[in-house]
């Protein structure tokens, strides 16, 4: 326990972690989730969640947990909307975080006429329109980029709103 606390403090230069996720349902992930619950109860972790779990996997965690996952991180984008999973998560008050919100940079998604037309209308890039689509759909998005201009553009999403027809 002391080593774990020292690791958080020294290696991460913090006394706590904002969000800790189990990456996938592999190995003894039930025991791993219970350890995450313990860290949460000790105040070392502010929120816990899951990544790459199916609806059934999330239900398995819900059946045994004392601390409900806050978030499920999974691939979501306009070509893979995961509507049934999102409905289930909403009933459980679990948020969805869109992994690969731009569809792995799928060239076809970036050329999708509805997003291109909306981008022209709002003077936004196709990526910005897709990220706005996520926000309006209730998804948490954390797009990644090494390009400073793209990072800045990824934040410039709140001065327009897509209509129902554009979504």
Model regions: which residues?
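N-terminal binding-site loop/beta-alpha segment at the start of enzyme catalytic domains
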Residues: 2, 15, 102-103
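Phosphate/pyrophosphate-binding loops at sites that engage ATP/ADP/AMP, CoA/4′-phosphopantetheine
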Residues: 8-15
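Acidic/hydrophobic-patterned starts of short beta strands in beta-sheet-rich repeat architectures
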Residues: 19-20
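Short, small-residue-biased leader/transition segments that mark boundaries at the very start
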Residues: 1-7
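Beta/alpha (TIM)-barrel catalytic core signal, keyed to glycine-rich beta->alpha loops juxtaposed to Asp/Glu
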Residues: 24-167
């Amino acid at each position: 326990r002391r080593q774990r606390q020292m690791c958080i403090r020294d290696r991460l230069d913090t006394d706590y972690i904002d969000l800790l996720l189990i990456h996938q349902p592999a190995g003894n992930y039930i025991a791993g989730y219970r350890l995450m619950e313990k860290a949460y109860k000790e105040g070392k972790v502010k929120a816990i969640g899951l990544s790459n779990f199916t609806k059934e996997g999330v239900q398995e965690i819900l059946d045994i947990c004392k601390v409900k996952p806050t978030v499920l991180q999974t691939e979501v984008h306009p070509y893979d909307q995961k509507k049934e999973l999102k409905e289930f998560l909403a009933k459980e008050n679990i948020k969805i975080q869109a992994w690969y919100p731009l569809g792995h940079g799928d060239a076809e998604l970036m050329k999708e006429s509805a997003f291109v037309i909306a981008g022209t209308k709002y003077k936004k890039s196709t990526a910005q329109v897709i990220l706005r689509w996520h926000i309006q759909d209730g998804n948490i998005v954390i797009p990644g980029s090494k390009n400073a201009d793209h990072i800045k553009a990824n934040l410039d999403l709140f001065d327009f709103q897509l209509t129902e027809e554009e979504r």
